[in-house]
């Protein structure tokens, strides 16, 4: 394979390896793009006050963003099997930049909801890169390279909270979304220069492509199992972050967006663990890694309830719930992609669609739980999601 400085001119072939510079670019852009979903989380209290809405309405901002991402997974990501990834990525980044500017300028929560929904749809680029890392890597490097790209993605998830917390506290929440639009334009220029040619793996019409996704879902029960199990684990993690700004705004913390953002650094443990987890999957198997992930999340919610008024308790909760979620995501996602090696984007679509439906439900349930029982309600909601995920593992044993 040509591994010179230019990667735009090469053509990737399955199982033949990915140039290191391209792999780094995929990880970096994955993180910067997926960050669009999470900038709003530390800023919810600031947005709520600025737009004069209640906590449930503010929580819906995160919810519709997650729903948009799920829709993008279902209708945009599969196109990577039949169209140019470079063109899909470019269109998505331009749209994401426009929606970020719209969010920064609006004074109506309804417009913010709509723009957040579309922003979620346009932020699915990482989910074209993760299966790409598996499909084109050398067989012995597939799990490792997937973990590398996921580490970049997860660093973006957690780094987004840190950056938005600081920018929101110092310059206001609207500034964060202007910055996000600039980041997307930079990613656009880089991706147009570096993304290589890749031959389509599907020949046919879009309707046939969508039907093939349904066929894969019907014919592969393990894909259904892995997807649903990971979805509940992700929902459990989203319960933490969807209400963190509200929890820290009250007694005894009285903290602003900067403090919420700083807690994002604690979740970096999950991002750092992702690459290592990928190495253990072939050795210990998907079920064992998932089991460990569920146990970590159960412990996390016990800590969250017992030490609700302690920063140390909150930090421990974030670390445990994030690492638990990454155990589930990487192991179950790897299992899904292994079921259909020639249709990785479509099987990844199924997996990630479930994941973000689970995340959306976790966000929604946590929002209503907060409105009813405050932090105790959030802990109960997160615990239920973790218990369901563990129950699936114990019953199915795969």
Each language-model region and where it sits:
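Juxtamembrane intracellular "pre-TM" segments in multi-pass secondary transporters
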Residues: 7-17, 195-228
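Helix-breaking motifs and short loop linkers at transmembrane-helix boundaries and internal kinks
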Residues: 52, 84, 105-110, 307-308
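Conserved MFS/SLC helix-loop-helix module at the cytosolic interface between two early adjacent transmembrane helices
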Residues: 71-107
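Helix-to-loop junctions at the C-terminal end of transmembrane segments
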Residues: 73-84, 273-286, 370
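Cytoplasmic helix-loop-helix junction between adjacent transmembrane helices
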Residues: 115-151
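Intracellular juxtamembrane helix-capping segments at the cytosolic ends
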Residues: 125-137, 327-340
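Helix-loop-helix hairpin linking two adjacent transmembrane segments in secondary transporters
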Residues: 148-195
């Amino acid at each position: 394979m040509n591994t010179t400085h230019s990667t735009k001119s090469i053509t990737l072939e399955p199982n033949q390896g990915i140039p290191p510079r391209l792999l780094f670019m995929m990880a970096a852009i994955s993180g910067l793009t997926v960050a669009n979903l999470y900038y709003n989380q530390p800023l919810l209290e600031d947005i709520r006050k600025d737009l004069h809405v209640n906590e449930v309405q503010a929580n819906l901002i995160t919810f519709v963003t997650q729903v948009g991402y799920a829709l993008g997974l279902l209708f945009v990501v599969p196109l990577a099997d039949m169209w140019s990834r470079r063109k899909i990525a470019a269109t998505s980044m331009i749209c994401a930049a426009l929606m970020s500017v719209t969010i920064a300028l609006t004074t109506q929560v309804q417009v913010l909801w709509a723009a957040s929904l579309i922003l979620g749809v346009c932020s699915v680029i990482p989910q074209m890169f993760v299966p790409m890392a598996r499909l084109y890597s050398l067989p012995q490097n597939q799990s490792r390279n997937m973990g590398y790209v996921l580490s970049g993605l997860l660093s973006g998830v957690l780094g987004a909270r840190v950056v938005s917390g600081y920018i929101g506290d110092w310059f206001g929440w609207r500034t964060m979304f202007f910055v996000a639009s600039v980041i997307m334009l930079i990613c656009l220029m880089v991706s147009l220069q570096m993304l290589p040619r890749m031959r389509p793996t599907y020949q046919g019409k879009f309707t046939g492509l969508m039907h093939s996704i349904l066929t894969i879902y019907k014919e592969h029960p393990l894909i259904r199992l892995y997807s649903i199990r990971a979805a509940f684990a992700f929902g459990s993690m989203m319960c933490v972050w969807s209400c963190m700004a509200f929890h820290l705004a009250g007694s005894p913390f009285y903290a602003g967006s900067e403090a919420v953002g700083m807690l994002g650094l604690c979740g970096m443990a999950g991002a750092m663990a992702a690459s290592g987890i990928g190495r253990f999957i072939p050795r210990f198997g998907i079920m064992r890694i998932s089991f460990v992930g569920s146990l970590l999340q159960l412990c996390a919610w016990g800590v969250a309830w017992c030490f609700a008024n302690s920063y140390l308790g909150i930090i421990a909760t974030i670390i445990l719930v994030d690492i638990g979620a990454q155990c589930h995501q990487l192991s179950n996602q790897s299992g899904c992609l292994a079921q259909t090696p020639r249709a990785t984007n479509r099987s990844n679509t199924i997996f990630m669609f479930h994941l973000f439906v689970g995340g959306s439900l976790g966000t929604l349930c946590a929002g209503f739980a907060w409105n009813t029982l405050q932090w105790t309600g959030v802990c109960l909601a997160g615990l239920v999601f973790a218990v369901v995920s563990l129950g699936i593992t114990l019953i199915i044993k795969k």
